[in-house]
């Protein structure tokens, strides 16, 4: 089993010529490769895409077999992927998914990091995160709008809708956390982001997600103060350990205006540098003594969260951004770790109630103009959504594409299928140079059960019920998505979440149009259903408005 190969540099093909037998198998192959593009993945030579050890394939042998199989797959066959390894090809039918993926799933009694690591070392499992193992990661853009929407809502709730002259304190500049600095600036706030790995700061600077780098707290704060004097928000990366810097900020009486965290705290071995440790020490100990790493990391997380609680008690609006750091701290004896809320119940759930979530699409042509044309079509189809228009304008101006050109755009039930059909028509007419791939994050309204994140504090107490993502995956399979995934442990770590994903190809054919209409209606419809079933009036009203058939509502 080979996981590290520094000789491998993966980039997807672009343009209209394909090496598979159809676009329905060319698309997952290109998206798998795009996940490992050096401008996209965090550690592509190790097959790691983002989120600690979130991988696209189990090992390089599995990667090669997946590509080989996709190239020969027939139009009525389905490839099965078990934790990043291709295990079977079966005859299905033309409207069935071409790929079905199950990643990181464990029977509940064994659903913990210790058992996962045992299997991982034996080559029997892979951590798929959310969009890493499901081949629809698009770089930090994939979470930018959701983060932006969260920060805007924080501004509405706490500062009258105006974040000018305000600053956000956070940590973590990995594949997900790397979106925070740009999202904050787009929302009108400055951002101080702590990151322990120089390579991550350098990547965010290179890709335009971060403006400046500072060597000390004082230098970072001076940069932010200067930006406020010029009425121009700035994002600053500070090299250091959050478990050391946050307590220092508390001791010095410094008060940010907003506070959150996106370190990879969900994975105490691979995702969080213990306080006082060097990177070299951390990397070595992860291999030689992972239990010691986990113990030290969790102790540091407790210190980190205590500092967040101190700032929260001092009146700083504070939110957990979904990395399970509160749970880790509580396990270490911080009994009031959940005194500050998660971002979904505090700021995002009303959107989920209407099936609104992280809809995304990718231009398989590799031509940015294809994305700009789809941006224009979105504005044309949704003429009254000025907030969305503003987002698209900012995205074009501020967001650099990583790998294949892509766009993230939060839309919901009733709009997703219209956009998908429009994109399909654009492919059919030749307005776009190649097909479009349409997908989403697993963080969506009906596709995840995660009691410390997306389903925290559900009205009816159904936080841990994971029937919903299973139903979502089954329905997307029956509806004809091109590939469907079912994962465990994404975002918050082993034992704390189950979630599903779907991707569908708009190749310009009438058959694709039928699949697009079904999938892109049904998928967000499950989100409205899930929240209506939990008793949310917004969701119940949306279900009635859209004519959903919900027998128990």
UniProtKB/Swiss-Prot annotation:
Kindly give the InterPro entries that the UniProt entry links to this protein.
Urocanase (IPR055351), Urocanase-like (IPR023637), Urocanase_C (IPR035401), Urocanase_central_sf (IPR038364), Urocanase_CS (IPR023636), Urocanase_N (IPR035400), Urocanase_Rossmann-like (IPR035085), Urocanase_sf (IPR036190)
User: Its GO CC terms?
Assistant: cytoplasm
Enzyme Commission number(s): 4.2.1.49
Q: Which GO terms describe its biological process?
A: L-histidine catabolic process to glutamate and formamide; L-histidine catabolic process to glutamate and formate
Cofactors that this protein relies on: NAD(+)
Catalytic class of the enzyme: lyase
Q: Where does NAD(+) bind?
A: 51-52, 129, 175-177, 195, 200, 241-242, 262-266, 272-273, 321, 491
Q: Name one GO molecular function term.
A: urocanate hydratase activity
Pathway note: Amino-acid degradation; L-histidine degradation into L-glutamate; N-formimidoyl-L-glutamate from L-histidine: step 2/3
Q: Which Gene3D superfamilies match?
A: Urocanase like domains, Urocanase superfamily
Entry keywords, A to Z: Cytoplasm, Histidine metabolism, Lyase, NAD
Per its record, the protein catalyses: 4-imidazolone-5-propanoate = trans-urocanate + H2O
Q: Which Pfam families match?
A: Urocanase, Urocanase_C, Urocanase_N
Q: Active site at which residues?
A: 409
This protein's record includes keyword Nucleus: no
What is the superkingdom listed in this entry's lineage?
Bacteria
Q: What is its main location?
A: cytoplasm
Its localization reads: Cytoplasm
Function of this protein? Catalyzes the conversion of urocanate to 4-imidazolone-5-propionate.
Entry's family note: Belongs to the urocanase family.
Protein name per the record: Urocanate hydratase
């Amino acid at each position: 089993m080979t996981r590290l190969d520094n000789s491998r540099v993966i980039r997807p093909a672009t343009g209209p010529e394909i090496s598979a037998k159809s676009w329905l198998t060319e698309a997952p192959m290109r998206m798998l490769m795009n996940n490992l593009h050096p401008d996209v993945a965090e550690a592509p030579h190790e097959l790691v895409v983002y989120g600690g050890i979130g991988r696209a394939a189990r090992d390089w042998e599995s990667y090669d077999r997946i590509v080989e199989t996709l190239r020969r797959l027939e139009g009525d066959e389905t490839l099965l992927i078990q934790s990043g390894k291709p295990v079977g090809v079966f005859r299905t039918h033309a409207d069935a998914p071409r790929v079905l993926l199950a990643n990181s799933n464990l029977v509940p009694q064994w659903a913990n990091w210790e058992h996962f690591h045992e299997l991982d070392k034996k080559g029997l499992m892979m951590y798929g995160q959310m969009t890493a193992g499901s081949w629809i990661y698009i770089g930090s853009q994939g979470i930018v709008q959701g983060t932006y929407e969260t920060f805007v809502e924080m501004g509405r709730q706490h500062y009258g809708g105006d974040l000018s002259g305000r600053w956000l304190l956070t940590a973590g500049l990995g594949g997900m956390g790397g979106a925070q600095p740009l999202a904050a600036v787009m929302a009108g706030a400055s951002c101080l982001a702590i990151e322990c790995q120089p390579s991550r700061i350098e990547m965010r600077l290179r890709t335009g997600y971060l403006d400046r780098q500072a060597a000390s707290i004082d230098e970072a704060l001076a940069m932010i103060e200067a930006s406020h004097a010029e009425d121009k928000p700035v994002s600053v990366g500070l090299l250091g350990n959050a478990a050391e810097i946050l307590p220092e900020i508390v001791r010095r009486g410094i008060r940010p205006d907003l506070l959150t965290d996106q370190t990879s705290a969900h994975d105490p071995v691979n995702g969080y540098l213990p306080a006082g440790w060097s990177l070299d020490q951390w990397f070595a100990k992860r291999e030689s003594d992972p239990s010691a790493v986990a113990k030290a990391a969790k102790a540091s997380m407790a210190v980190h969260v205590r500092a967040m609680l101190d700032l929260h008690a001092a009146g700083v609006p504070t939110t957990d951004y979904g990395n399970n750091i509160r749970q880790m701290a509580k396990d270490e004896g911080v009994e009031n770790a959940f005194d500050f809320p998660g971002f979904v119940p505090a700021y995002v759930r009303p959107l989920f109630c209407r099936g609104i979530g992280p809809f995304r699409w990718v231009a398989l042509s590799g031509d940015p103009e294809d994305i700009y044309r789809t941006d224009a079509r979105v504005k044309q189809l949704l003429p009254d959504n000025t907030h969305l228009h503003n987002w698209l304008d900012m995205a074009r101006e501020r967001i650099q594409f990583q790998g294949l050109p892509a766009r993230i755009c939060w839309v919901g039930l009733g709009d997703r299928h219209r956009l998908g059909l429009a994109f399909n028509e654009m492919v059919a007419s030749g307005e776009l140079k190649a097909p479009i791939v349409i997908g989403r994050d697993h963080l969506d309204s009906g596709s995840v059960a995660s009691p410390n994140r997306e389903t925290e504090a559900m009205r009816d107490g159904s936080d841990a019920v994971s029937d919903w993502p299973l139903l979502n995956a089954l329905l997307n399979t029956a509806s004809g998505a091109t590939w469907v995934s079912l994962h465990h442990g994404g975002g918050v770590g082993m034992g704390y979440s189950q979630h599903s994903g779907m991707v569908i190809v708009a190749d310009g054919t009438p058959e694709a149009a039928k699949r697009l209409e079904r999938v892109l209606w049904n998928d967000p419809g499950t989100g409205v259903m899930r929240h209506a079933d939990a008793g949310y009036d917004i969701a119940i009203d949306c279900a009635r408005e859209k004519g959903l058939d919900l027998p128990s509502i």
